[in-house]
Amino acid sequence: MSKTRLLEGPLRRSLLTSIARRLENVVKNHQRRVKSVNISVFGFSRGAAQARAFVHRLYEIAEVWGSGCGYNVAGVPMQLSFLGIFDTVASVGLAGISRVSDGKWDWAAGEMMSIHPEVRQCVHFAALHEQRINFPMDLAASGREALYPGMHSDVGGGYSPGAQGKDFVDGKADGTAKLAQIPLIDMHHEAIKAGALLKTMEEIRQDSIRAQHFGCHPQLIRDYNAWLTGHGAGGGAHAEQIRAHCRQYVAWKGMRLWNGEGSLLQQPFFKQADGEDQVDLANAQRDFANLVRNLAQGKKDMASYRANLAEIDDRIEVGRRMGRPVFVPVPRASQEAYDYAKIPAETSQLLDLVLDHAPVPEASAVLFDNYVHDSLAGFYIGTYTELNIPAVSTYGYLRYRGVFNIAGRQRQECRDPSSLPPANVPDIGTAFQQMGAAMGGF
């Protein structure tokens, strides 16, 4: 570790503590008294990673007070009531597309991506179908975590209505039919329950523009509920569920790969996409077809190569038993066979789903066709997508998403107030404890 990194923590804490002290003087000398601070933090993607890191940094400079179960900043009692985050992706420094990095540099390193134990309630909504190699996701080892169908931005938002021909109702793009509407409304509900000072749904409905942003089309609700009861992917640990749903998505990609009426290029969503999206989707389809074709040929060649080696071994064994030397030229494997031999086990497994025409539940196919976007097709790294970037084999759709699960620290035990420095016990602690009790207690 460099000297700069060794000094970074103390220097940062010194700077932030100095700012907190100046802020404390402002608070003390102001005629309006700040009795407590109740904090809610929200974030999506790298913003969710920053939200996690922000909470850790905040508690670096917070001081313990009262019974040792609370904290203050600038002499004011604070409570971090709610952390609402969508599909946490750090990718700090060299992203996951580099073989020498996991994207966990600087402020995303160590336990910084864990959920701080002083967060009263954490809710994390994670995407089931994202595959991009430079979008590894941090699960929430504590708090409440829910898995939602779709890609990264199908959960956290970001796709415009009608992007890639999705979210259409009666032939027209409809923002209330986006998959992201469901986790948005669910997060709003969880935040309100936790005491976050947001507008209620009743207040939102009184404003036509806000009401539109929080709308959820009956068609989406119907298809989403059908998927919930019909996907058949099973339960289990969240990392395993993500893999199970990835397999189902890859099977659907395979179903849409072959020529004929089932081809992706013949689907309504492709035909109603705009020209640029059609180019991206068609290019991704071509790259996927080439990958499957090359790996399928490599699998076939490798099987033939191994069969030839087995036959040679048999002939050599027969010659040995008969006391005769056997000279047989050793066959060479094709380049495709060598390439196939190097692929990860997960890629081989997912390839077989495509080659075997694995079935896809109808409810899942409806969701994939009409709502789930293709993040690999539309995400460019320079002038390339992950599917065709030179000299890097990511295996595109034939891979699982990277998932991290960092546990972090346990919440501290409460301490006897007499053991704490007097300066850390604000005289307005009683009011904050009463507020905490009203919100569900400490």
Provide a role label for each language-model segment:
Residues M1-F442:
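Active-site- or binding-pocket-proximal scaffold segments within functional domains
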